[in-house]
Amino acid sequence: MHNIESRIQDLKEAAGKLSIKIEVANLNDQEFAIQSGYCKLNGEDLIILDKNLPDEEHVLVILNTLKKFNLDDIYVADWIRERIDTDKTAGAQS
């Protein structure tokens, strides 16, 4: 079992291969409500993570974003591919 820091590093590497930028920010200090998640900003793919959330939540946000992209042509850690495949299978059954 990987520790949470190595899982986050694996996810950041996968996102980087897809040219997805990841920013961690204090979202409580914003003038308007922002939640962690994926967006496009000036044509660039971006994941914004609230620094006040636990690392486990960061993992989920990045994983949910990676599910939207084609990962067939890039290397991603086995656990990421397994998790995404498991989630897709579970979603197809419901």
Feature map (PLM): residue ranges:
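Auxiliary, metal-adjacent structural segments of Zn-dependent hydrolase domains
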Residues: 1-34
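Active-site scaffold of zinc-dependent metalloenzymes
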Residues: 27, 35-56
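Short C-terminal domain-edge/linker segments immediately following a structured domain
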Residues: 52-56, 77-82, 91
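C-terminal structural segments of small proteins and small subunits
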Residues: 63-87
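Short coil/turn linker and secondary-structure boundary residues
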Residues: 3-6, 53, 71-75
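Active-site alpha-helix of zinc metalloproteases
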Residues: 59-60
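Short acidic DE-rich linear segments
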Residues: 2, 86-94
